[in-house]
């Protein structure tokens, strides 16, 4: 687990529970696509980056589920990187209590305020910021969560977040969370 897998000249993914994308913008500056589920994931990611001599420039969040943003705070604190997000996802990333509140229908009881539903807060910069990497295309992928997006890198590698689930994931969880079924079906088309 936490193995770096190369998929193109400049794109990799870190094989872990919530796959983390890596885009090498130049010889040493990299962008992550999501950050894993917690501080421990962030620490393992940082070790992989350091081992390869890479500097983390920013994290590009696909959506605000805790398993995709849980490493943000740790990595931001360790590297000073930016965290990019957009729309409602940016609000949920900045104020993570919103996710269990949304799922529960009110302020979540203590049993719902844990790292699997509520990541630590991140300082967020919107995708529209002038420093967002111009070579990265943001692709709207609504359905699974409010404003989920994917990213197309310059070499046409596309990171699709939770738009598509593996057989293993479907077998493990049996029921997949879909916020908007109609939007999800349109995204798959």
Where do the protein language model's features map onto the residues?
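Conserved beta-strand hairpin/beta-sheet module of binuclear metal-dependent hydrolase folds
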Residues: 2-52, 150-161
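Short, flexible active-site-adjacent loop segments at beta-strand->alpha-helix junctions, enriched
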Residues: 18, 87-89, 97-99, 142, ...
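Active-site HxH/HxHxD metal-binding segment of metal-dependent hydrolases
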Residues: 42-43, 47-132
């Amino acid at each position: 687990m936490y193995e770096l897998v190369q998929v193109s000249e400049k794109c990799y993914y870190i094989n872990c529970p919530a796959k983390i994308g890596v885009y090498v913008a130049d010889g040493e500056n990299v962008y992550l696509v999501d950050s894993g589920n917690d501080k421990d994931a962030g620490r393992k990611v940082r070790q992989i980056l350091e081992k390869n001599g890479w500097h983390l420039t920013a994290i590009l969040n696909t959506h605000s589920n805790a398993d995709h943003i849980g490493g943000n705070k740790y990595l931001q604190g360790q590297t000073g990187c930016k965290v990019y997000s957009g729309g409602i996802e940016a609000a949920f990333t900045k104020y993570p209590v919103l996710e269990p509140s949304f799922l529960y229908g009110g302020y979540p009881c203590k049993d719902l305020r844990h790292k699997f539903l509520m990541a630590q807060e991140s300082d967020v910069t919107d995708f529209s910021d002038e420093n967002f990497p111009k070579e990265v295309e943001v692709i709207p992928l609504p359905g699974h969560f409010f404003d989920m997006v994917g990213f197309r890198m310059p070499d046409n590698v596309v990171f699709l977040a939770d738009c598509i689930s593996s057989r293993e994931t479907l077998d493990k969880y049996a029921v997949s969370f879909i916020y908007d079924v109609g939007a999800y079906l349109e995204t798959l088309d």
